[in-house]
Amino acid sequence: MIGTPYTEGARRAMLLGCGELGKEVAIELQRLGVEVIGVDRYPNAPAMQIAHRSHVINMLDAKALRAVIELEKPHLVIPEIEAIATQTLVEMEAEGLNVVPTARATKLTMDREGIRRLAAETLGLPTSPYFFCDTETEFNQAISKIGVPCVVKPVMSSSGKGQSVIRNVAQSAKAWQYAQEGGRAGGGRVIVEGFIPFDYEITLLTISAVNGIHFCAPIGHRQEDGDYRESWQPQAMSADVLAKSQAIASKVVEALGGYGLFGVELFVKGSDVYFSEVSPRPHDTGLVTLISQDLSEFALHVRAILGLPIPNIHQHGPSASAVVLVEGKSKNIRYQGLAAALAAENTQLRLFAKPEIDGRRRLGVALARDKDIDSAVNKALDSAAKVQVIF
């Protein structure tokens, strides 16, 4: 049962993280009559702008997190980022709090160690070789064992922060320092992974719902500096490789438990599929589904977490997304060139309405459909390039 916002019978959902992905989740929640409470570390975050009300706290502060949850008494807590005091969610779930998809899934996936050990050591899924390191000495030993090239990431980071590829050992010291600076919770433990010379990488959006496991068409994407630049759907792949990908994704999602949409990242090399990472929430590469599917990843996530069934997911055809990435410093961001950006048919634009920029930041995404993937990607890139950001 869903009541009406601001009434005694309202169904209340609390978003922990109010960025562009959380904003789309909030929109879908409101379409189904759910009262939305936004929580983030800074004011006027994108989802806060449309939430029924919001709070600014340090979500890594266990006391502050518990206090805001006890104040609002949400029926659902929906983590949208990694930087959260997840042990508090585990404790409060044991007290009766409903965490999406589960507090365990949120805790395991907030850092790369929990999910990598689950995938490789518990589930026996194929992954790259890896070591976890607490000190620079352990870090250098791991590099000597794995060899170069190898990939270095903080165990807790997102959007490529702190990630680098070591192509020769002379880059080791710089990579260690960069990883220490890039972690969401400060410096600390890192993972060193063997580099898989993959043919392509995909995100397989996997939904666990009341009526079973469902998959979106595979999404291909291009990464730069550890962050996505373009994504497209569907990624061309053989039926055999797709079946292997779905089998891996199913195992991971079922092991994590709960209802919701999961972004499962996989590497494909020939006919081999390797598990990379998973997010128990909508994925940034999945922004393409805003134009590629009848139900976006956000709509699917909300249906699943509300205990509603997932029907057949209709994919409209070759589609792509391209980010609007800007570097600068401003608290008065403005946009022009929108008419040109939207002049071509089957194009859309999402401006995230982030309140400020200090450095490099993703401020929007262009979306496009066309006759084939290359045409769709080029159309999305052209649209994104025409957006002019004024400081």
Swiss-Prot record:
What this protein catalyses is:
N(1)-(5-phospho-beta-D-ribosyl)glycinamide + formate + ATP = N(2)-formyl-N(1)-(5-phospho-beta-D-ribosyl)glycinamide + ADP + phosphate + H(+)
Provide GO CC annotations from the record. cytosol
The organism sits in which domain of life?
Bacteria
User: Which keywords belong to this entry?
Assistant: ATP-binding, Ligase, Magnesium, Metal-binding, Nucleotide-binding, Purine biosynthesis
Positions that bind ATP: 112, 153, 158-163, 193-196, 201
Which segments constitute the ATP-grasp domain? 117-306
Which PROSITE patterns does this one have? ATP_GRASP (PS50975)
* Entries under InterPro entries matching the protein: ATP-grasp, ATP-grasp_carboxylate-amine, ATP_grasp_subdomain_1, PreATP-grasp_dom_sf, PurT, PurT/PurK_preATP-grasp, PurT_C, Rudment_hybrid_motif
Job of this protein? Involved in the de novo purine biosynthesis. Catalyzes the transfer of formate to 5-phospho-ribosyl-glycinamide (GAR), producing 5-phospho-ribosyl-N-formylglycinamide (FGAR). Formate is provided by PurU via hydrolysis of 10-formyl-tetrahydrofolate.
Please name the HAMAP family in this protein's record.
Answer: PurT (MF_01643)
Q: Which NCBIfam families match?
A: PRK09288.1 (NF006766), purT (TIGR01142)
Q: Quaternary structure per UniProt?
A: Homodimer.
Task: Output this protein's name.
Answer: Formate-dependent phosphoribosylglycinamide formyltransferase
Q: Which organism is it from?
A: Shewanella oneidensis (strain ATCC 700550 / JCM 31522 / CIP 106686 / LMG 19005 / NCIMB 14063 / MR-1)
